[in-house]
Swiss-Prot record:
Subcellular locations according to the entry: Nucleus
Biased composition, class Polar residues, residue ranges: 19-29
GO BP terms: auxin-activated signaling pathway; cotyledon vascular tissue pattern formation; gravitropism; response to auxin; root development; skotomorphogenesis
Name of the protein described by the UniProt record: Auxin-responsive protein IAA20
The encoding gene: IAA20
Physiological role: Aux/IAA proteins are short-lived transcriptional factors that function as repressors of early auxin response genes at low auxin concentrations. Repression is thought to result from the interaction with auxin response factors (ARFs), proteins that bind to the auxin-responsive promoter element (AuxRE). Formation of heterodimers with ARF proteins may alter their ability to modulate early auxin response genes expression.
Stretches assigned to the PB1 domain: 84-173
Inducing factors: By auxin.
Organism: Arabidopsis thaliana
Principal location listed in the UniProt entry: nucleus
Amino acid sequence: MGRGRSSSSSSIESSSKSNPFGASSSTRNLSTDLRLGLSFGTSSGTQYFNGGYGYSVAAPAVEDAEYVAAVEEEEENECNSVGSFYVKVNMEGVPIGRKIDLMSLNGYRDLIRTLDFMFNASILWAEEEDMCNEKSHVLTYADKEGDWMMVGDVPWEMFLSTVRRLKISRANYHY
């Protein structure tokens, strides 16, 4: 029991000596280290973050351009598999966009109906341009060149071959 004796006590040993139901139990150290002995390094841009509750979480570095490109390619391949064609849809005033599978739709009317339901909005397109009111929105799309065009101005099949993104904007009508 002298001071010359060196002992390595863990937090579990020290906590078992105290009263687990007493007031001193709130001051004991409950941290636990989990070491699996896995050998993987941080040379590939992997960083470790505290995931809470004492766990470390491996996450790729934000600067790792190869990783970002691989994830984007994987997402694109996942979304555009055989029989599907997903495009992003953003609505003015809504901070989060959505994706919609155009191959599952049967034309412009089905697209408009789906977007009306998805965003709870009255959406106009080229065929219904004359029917406007104050709460209407206009559906446009970005083609391969990045030009924004009115949805419905070309046949559906041609639209599917050129569309890259959809945007729902407020219709600004000045009388």
